[in-house]
From Swiss-Prot:
It comes from Galdieria sulphuraria (Red alga). InterPro entries: bL21-like, bL21-like_sf, Ribosomal_bL21. GO terms for biological process: translation. Belongs to the bacterial ribosomal protein bL21 family. This is Large ribosomal subunit protein bL21c. It is found in: Plastid, Chloroplast. Its main location: plastid. One of its GO terms (molecular function) is structural constituent of ribosome. SUPFAM superfamilies: L21p-like. Although originally identified as Cyanidium caldarium, these sequences derive from Galdieria sulphuraria.
Amino acid sequence: MTYAIIENSGRQFFTEPGKFIDINHIKAEVGDIIYFNRVLLLKSNNLIEIGYPFINNIKVKAKILKHFKDKKIRVYKMNPKKGTRKTKGYRSLCTRVLIESIENTENIIN
């Protein structure tokens, strides 16, 4: 089993070929190929490589599947004994990407 842990927008994601992840919105078209080069950890066969902070020469290739809005986050504010209540909602834009492969500059791992 080959997998990698990548960093994108300050968040870490467990990725392996054939899986999809939901990340913050990326300004690209559906069907475009993108590369993540901030790889924190790579496991291939029985070899584990940890970056300090990132692993050089490793890229994760992904394809953009769709853009969508995430679930609504509700923020509720209330002042006790005053009778004031406020509810606000927010839906962030997200992008779903399909992990196609984990690539090395010399050869393709998977």
